[in-house]
């Protein structure tokens, strides 16, 4: 077995590498390493770099992808880009290279809204919260699930508790989310060898009656996970915790001022004309309106933007820039985001997914309740991975974006960000 491990500077990865059989060769990858890993070949770089990706996949047969769970970069945008575009590129390249299996490390924290009252197992729908440590693994799950659906790359998602070792457990108050690192390693080793195909999800919790998410389907014969650590010696140290609470809803207010992102496209141009008689409109795009007016229409008869007249205004705003988006939303009552990149494999994710994150962050920061986010029809995927075989398609069935056009999966990730 030739194993690639991303997020390899983590406690879980380091403990796994030490436990692997001698006949397994390991290539450990992360943005940086805090200390050397003498028992593995180490590479530093980013999964968004396609040249780096091609190099680290050479001769690899299996992948354990822990980067969305552990790797954080200079800012939120870079971390999200690595978790979304990086995971998407990794899975596609792995499928093309003939990798036999990919394991994704994710988190059981998705079920925090439920675990006070319910025993959530693998059949329950996750409830991720809008924080980076949940968005990154959740969006990686979404990206890899769609790649697995189309390419048949065997992909196992292991949602883990909070991985700790003996030293951490001895020096901290007991937390019911804990998962002993040795049990996490045992689950990963099991994931490398069990019979599986397509996309599968397993919940990897601790042993004992106190754990937040008890072992369910992962403990059945098909996967055979048997945790050994219940932290019983630390139960008495458990501190009181507040029950999960949803954020306070943003109150509604009259909508008089509207900011539009992506106003230079045909949809944005038509929208500006419709909004102008009724609202004060701030139109934004990545280029000045005069420059966009000089570009031929996207199709015959498609509308072009025109310079707005007072009290309306045009601002040059790049949705990839969180500070610019935040400033553009100041004083606004509603947001319409029609920004889009359809073909560029880099900016499709940076605009359609990370840009959506910037817009929603700005909406929350400014107390804007109404956000309109546009996206494509995602139900026309051809072949067995889509709904090509059916004729009765309703609006709320799960999307099937495929993987051949970056426009669709990147927009799906943006929609997930907005939903969360």
Residue spans for each PLM region:
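Glycine-rich NAD(P)-binding loop of the Rossmann-fold in SDR/ketoreductase-type enzymes
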Residues: 48, 78-89, 97, 131, ...
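Conserved C-terminal active-site "lid" loop/helix of NAD(P)H-dependent oxidoreductases
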Residues: 201-202, 207-230, 237-247
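Conserved Rossmann-fold NAD(P)-dependent oxidoreductase catalytic core, especially the SDR/UDP-sugar
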Residues: 89-128, 358-402
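Alpha-helical substrate-binding/gating segment
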Residues: 160-167, 178-201, 419-420
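Conserved glycine-rich Rossmann-like NAD(P)H-binding loop of the short-chain dehydrogenase/reductase
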Residues: 24-35, 279-291
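N-terminal Rossmann NAD(P)H-binding glycine-rich loop of SDR-like oxidoreductase domains
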Residues: 1-22, 250-278
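NAD(P)H-binding glycine-rich loop region in Rossmannoid oxidoreductase-like domains
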Residues: 43-83, 312-354
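Active-site Tyr-X1-5-Lys
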Residues: 128-155, 402-420
